[in-house]
């Protein structure tokens, strides 16, 4: 009997120890499967009371598990670190306002679980990874790549047509409920829509005469509407009073962004060079439906040419851009047989902050006209990828190094002409450029194939 009692006692003790062991396992701290490797993000999260082990894995305590929204506004956290927020098991909403993001925001940097996003106070014009879209039977059809139930946008986003418009219309077509709002001109949020204002009444009247089908009144267009049959392929061109009787009265070309930035319109060009007024525009993102973009005396906040794969004519002046990357355009990168009425032209002058110009390195190297004038911050330019031209103007008073074309032929009237024909190309330079050794070597080598001239508004050095 005593032995039996001892057995019962030992069994009870073992059972209690077993329960204690189970309780101990349940109380062991739990950590995220993946670590936060970005030190900046970890510092921010620690300051908010979240805890991490020595390997960067987050403690999944009540605070972490109950976090469904996270305020990272004003932290300027790198977007590359945002993927690591997947350590939060129940996080759905992010406030990223006032973080200095832009001009492009990469939606793919977000964890897929994020369905609410506040981007107010950022300078975002473009999105990567939000939608893919194409035109089918005059309708824009979109595939949404990242679903949102809440999306708050900065005012700069009103110039985005390629991503936000199809995201909005596709959600509307599928009857999805999305709290989609955008900051208006007064600085407050309002429900997103596809109506956009052309504020200058004379410019609006000019555009309405060309594209009446997308105007909802005298000064507003609907960026989701397709162009009428007769409007497709219509160019925006303002250079002379003969083109528009009220051209002198236009004080602003704001709103032209909605045309330049609409990749769903058929091929056309935008050319505004009536130089009596200084204009300004916001973000420009021409895609492969724009063959020419000419904006003379026009300040430009942002210009993205990364997808301007059909652009062969670019003319700019009086803006504050610091770099121009032409490597994805057709400028000096177009086969002669494919030259169109707009030619192959690059003109840039009176842009005080321009420091760098990039040309396609392995292109066909043919330009009809290339003009670089009054670019005081441009110290070096490499034109070695150019092999044929009709006119070349280099008026760079602060230039320290000009790498000249490997000049092989003269471009003339749609043909490439051998030097033996006696035809010559125009070569105009400023005195400072003439004094560069590379210029003197270029002249010495090709003098008989070149003739002296100056572009309108600039006085050149008579090197010949």
Question: Model-derived features: where do they sit?
Answer:
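Bacterial N-terminal signal peptides that target proteins for export
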Residues: 1-9
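C-terminal motif of bacterial Sec signal peptides marking the signal peptidase cleavage site
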Residues: 17-21
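N-terminal capping/linker segments that flank leucine-rich repeat
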Residues: 22-84, 93, 123, 134-135, ...
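Conserved hydrophobic beta-strand positions in leucine-rich repeat
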Residues: 68-72, 94-96, 115-119, 149-151, ...
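Canonical leucine-rich repeat
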Residues: 70, 80-85, 104-110, 127-130, ...
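Conserved "Asn-ladder"/turn position within leucine-rich repeats
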Residues: 75, 99, 122, 154-157, ...
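Leucine-rich repeat
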Residues: 87-90, 109-113, 133-137, 144-147, ...
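Ankyrin-repeat and related helical/solenoid repeat scaffolds used for protein-protein interactions
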Residues: 100-102, 107-155, 348, 353-430
